[in-house]
Design a protein with these regions (language model features):
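Terminal amphipathic helices with adjacent charged low-complexity linkers/tails
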Residues: 90, 219-236, 351-374, 392, ...
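Glycine-rich beta-alpha loop elements in corrinoid/cobalamin-binding modules
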Residues: 58, 66, 85-284, 297-390
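N-terminal pre-triad scaffold of radical SAM enzymes
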Residues: 54-59, 426-462, 496-498
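Catalytic cores of alpha/beta
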Residues: 575, 640-655
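Acidic, low-complexity intrinsically disordered tails
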Residues: 2-20, 273-281, 311-326, 750-806
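Conserved SAM/AdoMet-binding glycine-rich loop
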Residues: 53-56, 69, 83-84, 88-89, ...
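Flexible glycine/acidic-rich beta-alpha junction loops that bind and position SAM and/or redox cofactors
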Residues: 113-122, 170-172, 199-210, 231-239, ...
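Amphipathic alpha-helical packing elements
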Residues: 187-199, 713-757
C-alpha cells in the first residue's frame, strides 16, 4: 500500500486585528450604545451607517452577545455601526430604519440557532425566549437568517449582505434539518447572501469591511479564511487551484506495478513498449513554458488529463463544473510515497447536495470529511455542488479562521461595552430588572468569559464546529480589568462573580505542547479516547487567575458556573482542591452524559470511571474544607447509540447513587453535528464510511415518540407518572425482577393515587411561602441550555401520595 506524504504545517500567522488603518478619524469616538434609530444616529453626528447589523436577539451591549462583539470590533476599526434588533419581519420597512448602509448588512440569527431557540427537542414550540425582553417568545421567525436576508434585499437590493452567527455557521453546507426531517441546501444558497462568515468572525469581518471600504466588489472577495461563497459554472478564478474529488466512497484505487530495482527507468519503459523521451523533454522545459501548476513540485505530482479527478473518475460523469484543476499523483523517486499538491491551493470536492440528499452513505462521508478539515493549521478548502446542469453552483468554503492571539482576545474583550441592555428595553423606572428583564443577560450579568474554543469534541455539541478546537485565552490582566469593571459599573453587583469560565471551565491556557504538532493534527478530540500525550494539562495559570481574582477588593466570591471537564481536572489535584475549596457555591456542574460504553463511544465522552475518580476527589476536598457541596451531573436521553438496556442501566446507577433528575434533556439533532449525521444516516462518521456493511459501523438510533419517551422515563425513574410505562418496558425486556417494593428494585408495584404533576388552572389568592435555599443531595439538572430551569409540573418537587400495595 502506497502512503501519502504530508509535510508538517508551519505555525499559523495572520494580520493582527489592530494592524488596519481606521476607516474614519477618531473624532467620532465610541458610542455609549451602538445606534438603533435615526434619532440616536443624529445625536452621534452620523448621517449614515457604514455597517448595519440585523440580529434576532435583543441588543445587549455585552461581550457575551455576538452583535455587540462584532459591532464594537468594527467600531474600533473606525466604521459607523448601527443595530436593528429583532425587527418585525412582516415587511421590509423596519429594515430601512437606519437608512442604506454604505458598505454592507451584517445578518445574524443571534446567539442561538433560531429553530433550537423556538422548538424543544420534541419539536414543540417553546413559550419563552431568553434573548427577548420579558422572556417573551415569538420575536423572531423560523430560520430567521433566511427571512432577514430576504427583507434586507427587499429594502436595499444593491447592498452586499454578509451572513454570520451560529445558525448560518452550522448550515454552511448541505445539512440535515431535524424540524423538516430532510436534507436542506446550504443556507448561503437558500438565502442568496453574498458572503457567509462562519465561526468567531472578528478577523474575517474586519478584512471584508476594509476591502469593501476600498470599493472592492464583494464578488471578488474569495480568499478570506472563515468565509463561504457561491461560485458559478463559468467562474475561472479558481483555475490555479487543484481539486481532490471526494464525492464518492468505495471507488477502487489505482494499481501500481511493483518496481524492479534492477531495471533503470529507460529499461522499464522499453519493456512496456514506451519511451521516457517525453518525460525527459518536459523536465527540461524552462519554468516560463510550464502550464499553471504543472511542475510546482517537480516530479512529486502532475496535473491529471482534462476532466479527470484525483481518484480517476471523470468529472463529466458527475456533471461537475470543473472550476479547479484536477490532479493525479505519482510516487516520489526519493521516498516512494505519494505526494499531494500544496494544501493552501487544494480544494476537496464533497458529494453534491443532490447526492447527500438521496444517499445516506454519502451524507455520512461528507460529514466525516468536513470534520477532518477543521484544523486551521492543515484544513483545505471545500466545495459542494448545488443544482444540476446550467443552474449548478458551487458552495466554496475556505479554511477556518486563524485563532486570535492573547493580545487580540484582550483587544476584543477590552472594547468599551456598556455591559447593559439598550435603554429602550428599560421599564418605566429605567431598570432592566422588572418585567422587561432579558433572561439571557441576567445569566451572564456578573460573569466573565476567559477563553474560547473547546478540544473536547463531543459529537452532539456545536462548540467545536463553531469556535474550533484551539483554545484562545485572554491575559490575566484583561480578565482582572473586566472583574473590576463589573464591580465598579454594573448595577446590582453584590460582590459575587457568577462564573469565570467559557465553553468549558478548565481549558484556560491549555494547549498542545508543540505548535507544529497542533497544526498537523487531524484528531477530532484531544481528550478522547484518552488524553493526548501531547496535550499540556497544567492548570497552574488557571489557579493563579482564581487566586488573583478572589483577592480583589469588593469581590466576595468567585463561582465557577461553566461545565467542568472532569477527566482533565483529575490530572491536576491542586486545581480540584482550589476549585472545591473556594469556587463552588454548593453545586458544581459536570457532564458524564451517560454510564454505558455504547452511547459514550458515540458521544466521544470518557467512561464513568473518570467521573468516579473526580467524585472521590471532590468529596475529599469538600470534607477537608468543611463544606457541604454536591455535584450536578448532566445526562442525555435518546442519544444515537443508546439502547433501551443502556437507559435501564443508567436508571439503576442513578437510583444507586441517589440522583433524581428535575428535568430531562433529550438528544437534539443540531445541524452539522457528528451525532446528527449518525441520527440521519444510522452510520458512525467517526469510523470509516463504506457501503460494505462489514466495514461500516451501524448505529442504533432512538426514533419515534414512544421510544424517546421511554428513554426520558428511565432518566426520571422516580416520577410516578413514568412507572406504568417503565413497568411495561421492563416486562418486555425480561427484567420484571426490577419491579418491586424493595431497595434493590427500580420501580414499585403500586401506583399512587395522585402523581403530583397536576396544577389547578385557578389562580391562588395567596403567596406561597419562601422556599429555603438549603442544598439537596442527589439533585441533577439535565438541561444543557445554560439557562434557568423551568420549574413546572412535577419538576417543582411535589411529592406523590403513596398508596399501599394491594
Amino acid at each position: 500500500m502506497t502512503s501519502v506524504s504530508t509535510a508538517a504545517a508551519p505555525p499559523l500567522a495572520a494580520r493582527a486585528l489592530t494592524a488596519y488603518k481606521p476607516f474614519w478619524a477618531k473624532r467620532f469616538g465610541p458610542a455609549p450604545f451602538l445606534p438603533t434609530s435615526r434619532a440616536e444616529m443624529a445625536l452621534l453626528g452620523w448621517d449614515s451607517c457604514d455597517v448595519v447589523i440585523v440580529s434576532g436577539d435583543a441588543y445587549v451591549d455585552h461581550p457575551s452577545f455576538g452583535m455587540a462583539v462584532i459591532g464594537r470590533t468594527l467600531e474600533a476599526q473606525g466604521f459607523r455601526v448601527g443595530i436593528i434588533a429583532q425587527p418585525d419581519w412582516n415587511s421590509a420597512e423596519p429594515f430601512r430604519a437606519l437608512g442604506k448602509p454604505n458598505l454592507f448588512f451584517g445578518v445574524t440569527a443571534g446567539n442561538m440557532d433560531s429553530m433550537i431557540n423556538r422548538y424543544t427537542a420534541d419539536r414543540k414550540i417553546r413559550s419563552d425566549d431568553a434573548y427577548t425582553p420579558g422572556g417573551q417568545g415569538g420575536a423572531r421567525p423560523d430560520r430567521c437568517s433566511l427571512v432577514y436576508v430576504q427583507r434586507c434585499k427587499e429594502a436595499f437590493g444593491d447592498v452586499p449582505i454578509v451572513l454570520g452567527g451560529i445558525e448560518a455557521s452550522l448550515r454552511r453546507i448541505a445539512h440535515y434539518d431535524y424540524w423538516q426531517d430532510k436534507v436542506r441546501r446550504s443556507m448561503l444558497v437558500d438565502s442568496k447572501a453574498d458572503l457567509l462568515l462562519y465561526g468567531n468572525a472578528e478577523r474575517a469581518v474586519i478584512e471584508v469591511a476594509h476591502r469593501l471600504a476600498r470599493r472592492e466588489p464583494v464578488q471578488r472577495i474569495t480568499d478570506v479564511r472563515g468565509t463561504a461563497f457561491v461560485r458559478r459554472r463559468d467562474d475561472t478564478t479558481a483555475s490555479d487551484w487543484f481539486e481532490l474529488d471526494s464525492s464518492e466512497v468505495d471507488l477502487p484505487g489505482r494499481l501500481d506495478e511493483h518496481i524492479n530495482p534492477y531495471q533503470s527507468t529507460d529499461e522499464r519503459a522499453a519493456s512496456q513498449g514506451t519511451s521516457c523521451a517525453k518525460e525527459q523533454a518536459a523536465n527540461e522545459l524552462p519554468s516560463s513554458r510550464r502550464t499553471p501548476g504543472s511542475s510546482v513540485l517537480g516530479e512529486e505530482w502532475i496535473p491529471a488529463s482534462a476532466g479527470m479527478t484525483a481518484n480517476g473518475v471523470g468529472a463529466a460523469a458527475h456533471g461537475l463544473a470543473v472550476v479547479a484543476m484536477p490532479v493525479s499523483h505519482k510516487p516520489s523517486r526519493k521516498t516512494g510515497k505519494l505526494a499531494l499538491p500544496p494544501r493552501e491551493r487544494t480544494v476537496i470536492r464533497l458529494p453534491s447536495y443532490e447526492q447527500v440528499k438521496s444517499d445516506a452513505v454519502l451524507y455520512a462521508h461528507a460529514n466525516r470529511v468536513l470534520h477532518l478539515e477543521t484544523n486551521p493549521g492543515n484544513a483545505r478548502a471545500l466545495v459542494q455542488r448545488h443544482g444540476q446542469g446550467v443552474t449548478a453552483r458551487d458552495v466554496w468554503i475556505n479554511p477556518p479562521p486563524i485563532p486570535l492571539t492573547t493580545a487580540e482576545m484582550d483587544h476584543v474583550f477590552d472594547l468599551p461595552y456598556a455591559r447593559s441592555p439598550h435603554p429602550s428595553y428599560a421599564d418605566a423606572s429605567g431598570s432592566h430588572d422588572g418585567p422587561t428583564k432579558i433572561p439571557a443577560w441576567e445569566m451572564i450579568r456578573f460573569s466573565v468569559n476567559i477563553m474560547r474554543g473547546c478540544f473536547g469534541g463531543c459529537t452532539f455539541c456545536s462548540i467545536t464546529e463553531h469556535e474550533g478546537r484551539i483554545i484562545q485565552s485572554r491575559s490575566e490582566d484583561s480578565v482582572i480589568r473586566e472583574i473590576e469593571e463589573i464591580r465598579d459599573r454594573v448595577k446590582g453587583f453584590t460582590g459575587v462573580i457568577s462564573d469565570l469560565g467559557g465553553p468549558t471551565a478548565n481549558m484556560y491556557r491549555i494547549a498542545c505542547k508543540s505548535t507544529a504538532i497542533e497544526s498537523a493534527c487531524r484528531k477530532p478530540s484531544c481528550v478522547y479516547p484518552g488524553i493526548c500525550p501531547n496535550l499540556n494539562t497544567d492548570h497552574t495559570p488557571l489557579i493563579k487567575l482564581y487566586r488573583r481574582a478572589r483577592s480583589l477588593r469588593g469581590v466576595k466570591k468567585i463561582l465557577i458556573g461553566s461545565g467542568l471537564r472532569y477527566d482533565l481536572a483529575v490530572q491536576s489535584p491542586e486545581y480540584v482542591k482550589e476549585l472545591v475549596t473556594h469556587h463552588v457555591g454548593g453545586y458544581l456542574k459536570i457532564a458524564p452524559e451517560h454510564t454505558e460504553g455504547g452511547p459514550l463511544s458515540k458521544m466521544m465522552k470518557p467512561g464513568i470511571g473518570s467521573y468516579e475518580r473526580f467524585r472521590k476527589m471532590f468529596e475529599q476536598f469538600s470534607a477537608e474544607a468543611g463544606k457541604k457541596q454536591y455535584l450536578i451531573p448532566y445526562f442525555i436521553a435518546a442519544h444515537p447509540g443508546t439502547s433501551d438496556e443502556d437507559m435501564m442501566n443508567l436508571a439503576l446507577w442513578l437510583k444507586k447513587n441517589g440522583f433524581k433528575a428535575d428535568q430531562v434533556q433529550t438528544f437534539y439533532p443540531s445541524p452539522m453535528a457528528t451525532a446528527t449525521a449518525m441520527y440521519h444516516t444510522n452510520l458512525n462518521p467517526l469510523k470509516g464510511i463504506s457501503r460494505d456493511p462489514q466495514r461500516a459501523e451501524k448505529v442504533d438510533i432512538v426514533r419515534g415518540e414512544n421510544r424517546r419517551r421511554l428513554h426520558k422515563a428511565f432518566l426520571r425513574w422516580h416520577d410516578a407518572n413514568n412507572w406504568p410505562l417503565l413497568r411495561e418496558a421492563l416486562q418486555k425486556m425480561g427484567r420484571a425482577d426490577l419491579i418491586g417494593n424493595g431497595k434493590h428494585h427500580l420501580i414499585p408495584t403500586y401506583q399512587p393515587t395522585t402523581h403530583g404533576s397536576y396544577e389547578s388552572p385557578r389562580r391562588k389568592n395567596s403567596t406561597p411561602a419562601a422556599v429555603g435555599s438549603s442544598l439537596k443531595r442527589g439533585r441533577i439538572l439535565t438541561q444543557h441550555t445554560g439557562l434557568p430551569p423551568r420549574e413546572t409540573g412535577a419538576a417543582k418537587g411535589a411529592v406523590p401520595r403513596r398508596r399501599k400495595p394491594a
